[in-house]
Amino acid sequence: MKAFLFSFCYNILYTVGWLVTLPSYLLKQKRRGGFGTGLLERFGLYRVSYNREPKGVLYVHAVSVGEVVLALKFLRAWLRERGGSAVLATSTATGHATAVSAQIPGVRVIYAPFDLLGLPGRCFDRFEPEAIVLVEAELWPNFARAAKVRGIPMAMINARMSARSESRYRAFKSVSYTHLTLPTN
């Protein structure tokens, strides 16, 4: 019941907040060059060419330019050691441009879906990731729930969390973070 109530309230508040800020978001995206394909991808709508993507990819979620730079280093090392392919999801036009310009073979760069109910799941159904790596400690409830429902393990890199924040995450772990390990150290 607690998880349902949290999810219900979160989705109402997030959707209302999203609708209120949408005009300024669209203006900002247009100015920064992320308006075209990026907006469709934020709704989980991908170009036809993505239909040919291999399934079972590593999904790396990096929001800003700094996180993308770290994610690119991680992906180069991961793919050199293990091979395969990956999806790098970014949230900003500048982060997206940085990721695209790196041109790492086997890495598809997409815009991360909004955390609106159903959109993260649509993305995961499209790319069928084997695992998700979050750069930094940015957790979105619908994103985490969609991963949990699909049995996709999640890990964080470069995440620092205070004891206070950790206790808050653990207090809400019944909501959607039960499959995310929060190591101490």
Give names to the regions the model predicted.
Residues 37-44, 113-115, 136, 166-170:
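Short gly/ser/thr-rich secondary-structure transition/capping motifs
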Residues 2-39, 175:
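A transmembrane-helix-recognition feature enriched in membrane-embedded lipid enzymes
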Residues 131, 147-160:
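Active-site proximal beta-strand in glycosyltransferases
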Residues 104-107, 127, 150-152, 172-175:
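Short, hinge-like loop/turn segments at secondary-structure boundaries
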Residues 115-121, 160-177:
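Nucleotide-sugar donor phosphate/pyrophosphate-binding loop at the beta->alpha transition
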Residues 23-84, 88-100:
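N-terminal signal-anchor transmembrane helix
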Residues 178-184:
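Conserved small/polar residues in nucleotide/adenosyl-binding loops
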